[in-house]
Amino acid sequence: MFLLTGYEYFLGFLLIAAAVPVLALVTNLIVAPKGRAGERRLTYESGMEPIGGAWIQFNIRYYMFALVFVIFDVETVFLYPWAVAFNRLGLLAFIEALIFIAILVIALAYAWRKGALEWS
């Protein structure tokens, strides 16, 4: 006797979802033109000949600011549903949110103290 009755559609969907990307990659390997590695590595600037190199180094500070932004952006994503359902959640959820915000404030203070937010 099969114990997973009712899951046939899910299994079929899962197999199709796994097969479509594999089929797309295999089709690309078969159909794509080969031997144009030199052209492929050139910088494209609207059909014009590129001026200068495209491989430049960015200052690591950009990554630090981006990382701090992502952290607080994720905080917003987590706090928005909490704020919408604030009246129904009660005191325990409020305390959990305060702990979450406190952890992020401590992380911000740590980053600030280490100089991650200063451009020097």
From Swiss-Prot:
Transmembrane segments: 10-30, 64-84, 89-109
Coiled-coil blocks: none
Membrane topology, from the record: Multi-pass membrane protein
Recorded catalytic activity of this chain's protein: a plastoquinone + NADH + (n+1) H(+)(in) = a plastoquinol + NAD(+) + n H(+)(out); a plastoquinone + NADPH + (n+1) H(+)(in) = a plastoquinol + NADP(+) + n H(+)(out)
Keyword DNA-binding: no
Gene Ontology molecular function: NADH dehydrogenase (ubiquinone) activity; quinone binding
Major localisation: membrane
GO annotation terms (biological process): photosynthesis, light reaction
Gene Ontology cellular component terms for the protein in this record: NADH dehydrogenase complex; plasma membrane-derived thylakoid membrane
Entries under InterPro entries matching the protein: NAD(P)H_OxRDtase_bac/plastid (IPR023043), NADH_UbQ/plastoQ_OxRdtase_su3 (IPR000440), NDAH_ubi_oxred_su3_sf (IPR038430)
Sorted UniProt keywords: Membrane, NAD, NADP, Plastoquinone, Quinone, Thylakoid, Translocase, Transmembrane, Transmembrane helix, Transport
Compartments reported by the entry: Cellular thylakoid membrane
EC number: 7.1.1.-
Top enzyme category: translocase
Family: Belongs to the complex I subunit 3 family.
PANTHER family according to UniProt: NADH-UBIQUINONE OXIDOREDUCTASE CHAIN 3
Subunit structure: NDH-1 can be composed of about 15 different subunits; different subcomplexes with different compositions have been identified which probably have different functions.
Function comment: NDH-1 shuttles electrons from an unknown electron donor, via FMN and iron-sulfur (Fe-S) centers, to quinones in the respiratory and/or the photosynthetic chain. The immediate electron acceptor for the enzyme in this species is believed to be plastoquinone. Couples the redox reaction to proton translocation, and thus conserves the redox energy in a proton gradient. Cyanobacterial NDH-1 also plays a role in inorganic carbon-concentration.
Protein's name according to its UniProt entry: NAD(P)H-quinone oxidoreductase subunit 3
Gene it is expressed from: ndhC
